[in-house]
Amino acid sequence: MHDPSELLEDGPAAVRRLARRRYDLDLAALEKAVRRRSEAQAEVTRLRTELNRTSRARGRSGPPSEEEKEAARALRADVQQAEATARTAGHDLTELLLGIPNVPLDSVPDGDTDQEAVEVRRWGRPPHDAGTDARHHSDIGESLGILDGPAAAKLSGSRFSVGRGAGARLERALADFFLDLHTGEHGYTEYSVPFLVNRDTMTGTGQLPKFEDDLFRTQVGDRELFLIPTAEVPLTNLVAQQLLDARALPYAFTARTPCFRAEAGAYGRDTRGILRLHQFEKVELVRVCAPEDAPAQLELMVGHAEECLRRLELSYRVVQLPAGDLGFSARMTYDIEVWLPGSDAYREISSVSDCGTFQARRADIRHKRADGRKAPAATLNGSALPIGRTVAALLEQGVREDGSVLLPEALVPYTGFRRILPGGATA
């Protein structure tokens, strides 16, 4: 969420920056909402002052008359009405601000889609010459007997998956490998968090109110909860409504959770395989820091996600997203795209985003500086990594001419095997 005074002060510059992400900022509506709230708050202050003044005056002049009692009752009613008006004005301003996305950094390139992302670097090379025919991961997994799409469809419908035998073991191994790397070498603290959260928690990280159609919601009686679309939501909100000691920053959190997404805008896309599911597992990274440290923290987190892929010997590239393709809460994002021979393309496997103070203002995450000033902190988040997409990449990059899949050496301590053979046997 934004500080409205900053948006109004920036004026046309704020309009221009938000237009880069195809958002039309209505300065006149914002100014009207701010003025309405200010005037309502001023009226509350005026009436309370008047009520206090008359109360003190009556106390000095003896018992009040019936006329004075009636005047006092009327004044108290006016105060209550003014307070209600101020609450409404404040609510209306908050609702307006909650719908305004983060402002892209000036260094973010122009453009509207991931096709206009700017490549930053590559690691490895697309294994066209690996001596194998390019095959889609769903074909590989089903031929090995480790992915069962029909079973998933029978249980839950489209966009779900079932892993079996060595496939399920591989998923568990990847999650443990990622968590061990992040906690043992990258300095993150692991958390076990709820998968169901309330509306305030979803609002704090920016999923609500704008993206309610993309979320799975539960309702039991009058209790409403949402299934998390990413562990970013509970991890970031661990420090919601808190004043943090700047000397303790940065905080670094990680968690492995299932993620639930309705994928309302993805009709017809990636209907085969395990790239785009309603439910998938992911290891998430979240960092909370002083705002001036956010750029360096972003680069650090990208490096942590890249290290996962390098240890797994998976070819990938890093791209910077254009302004029009940024997530609602992000002011800058790097996507890491892994090479998928079966698609003959790089596909996103991680997004790492700098949200600046945007989420912190929504969730009331502040830090106390050395000089005593209290100010919003900065938040960052990134995938490192989603389990299903990593499995897809390992299958497509690791398949051999005999139909077996060779896994990276780094996973052997976690899987207990290096190769998955046709029929699901391991070696």
UniProtKB/Swiss-Prot annotation:
Positions of region (Disordered): 35-72
Binding sites annotated in the UniProt record for L-serine: 230-232, 284, 383
Disulfide bridge positions per record: none
Residues the entry annotates as binding ATP: 261-263, 348-351
Listed SUPFAM superfamilies: Class II aaRS and biotin synthetases, tRNA-binding arm
Family annotation (InterPro entries): aa-tRNA-synt_IIb, aa-tRNA-synth_II, aa-tRNA-synth_II/BPL/LPL, Ser-tRNA-ligase_type_1, Ser-tRNA-synth_1_N, SerRS_1_N_sf, SerRS_core, tRNA-bd_arm
First and last residue of the signal peptide: none
Uppermost EC category: ligase
GO molecular function: ATP binding; serine-tRNA ligase activity
Keywords: Aminoacyl-tRNA synthetase, ATP-binding, Cytoplasm, Ligase, Nucleotide-binding, Protein biosynthesis
UniProt-listed GO biological process terms: selenocysteine biosynthetic process; seryl-tRNA aminoacylation
Domain notes per entry: Consists of two distinct domains, a catalytic core and a N-terminal extension that is involved in tRNA binding.
PANTHER family noted in UniProt: SERINE--TRNA LIGASE, SERYL-TRNA SYNTHETASE
Membership in a protein family: Belongs to the class-II aminoacyl-tRNA synthetase family. Type-1 seryl-tRNA synthetase subfamily.
Function of the protein: Catalyzes the attachment of serine to tRNA(Ser). Is also able to aminoacylate tRNA(Sec) with serine, to form the misacylated tRNA L-seryl-tRNA(Sec), which will be further converted into selenocysteinyl-tRNA(Sec).
Quaternary assembly: Homodimer. The tRNA molecule binds across the dimer.
Protein name (Swiss-Prot/TrEMBL): Serine--tRNA ligase 2
Gene: serS2
